Swiss-Prot record:
It comes from the Archaea. GO terms for molecular function: structural constituent of ribosome. This is Large ribosomal subunit protein eL32. It comes from Thermococcus onnurineus (strain NA1). SUPFAM superfamilies: Ribosomal protein L32e. GO terms for cellular component: cytosolic large ribosomal subunit. GO terms for biological process: translation. Transmembrane segments: none annotated.
Amino acid sequence: MNEKARLLRIRARLKRKKPRFLRQEWWRYPKFKNDPKWRRPKGIDSKMRLKKKGKARSPSIGWSSPRLVRGLHPSGYEEVLVHNVKELEAIDPARQAARIARTVGARKREMILARAKELGVKVLNP
């Protein structure tokens, strides 16, 4: 069995159980609700900082994915952002996949897709 594939399956299983880490009292203020991100609780009486039962979970090293597959696409490829054909040609098709930048227009996108097919490079957003 391939080690990378095994670790990707483990990462997928871990991600299903991982909670959304939101800041303390995110539900209370509209400015927090519309901008969901983690901020460490720092209040002296904060139950969340003290890790009390029933309060929201905090990020810690135990929630991270296996080191070998951290940051990889679920398909197992390393993502590389591509703006033109020249950047596409620098990609290693065995371990990297291209993601076409959102600023690329339709004409250049077609050129990139055609060249990717020739080179055998996987495009994540064709």
